[in-house]
Amino acid sequence: VDDGSTNIKLAWVEDGAVKTLISPNSFKPEWSMTLQGLTDATVPASANYEIDGEKYSFDQLSPDAVRTTETRYQYSDVNVVAIHHALMQSGIAPQPVDIVVTLPLGEYLDENDQPNLANIERKKNNVRRTVTVQGRENFTIRKVSVLPESVPAGFDVLKDLNDLESLLIVDIGGTTLD
């Protein structure tokens, strides 16, 4: 899970094939009206979520959408809701899952360029919180691993580099450049 400030990007393996999904971050406080009963669907077409007693809904057009382009988003309710929303959009049946999420380099590393264990643990604790989905089963985050943004993109390339080669990764995100 690349839980960036403007989109959540998912990648998973299903039936031997890598699947991907991009889900925009646009959530407003409070729930939106559902259209249950107006379609043949057995579950509501809404995207209403609750976390720690706070209600949010996915709404790409709302002027009241919560701002996600700040560092505090990484540890916020909306970050967790956005991850769950992306999982719900993936088509994967709700179940316990293990995920890998990211932090911007400035949050992942401390002033000595070492992993900032306090921020990493804060991120893990945030993502493990329970999110309920109105009228539907929800995912349970069983295990969370945290990596610095941009670095996971190079894993496949790094294994094929020799000792004299190097790799530069430029991650142009919605609000950061790593």
Predicted segments with their positions:
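Nucleotide/phosphate-binding catalytic cleft detector across ATP-hydrolyzing
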Residues: V1-I169
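Basic (Lys/Arg-enriched) interaction patch that binds polyanionic ligands
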Residues: S166-D178
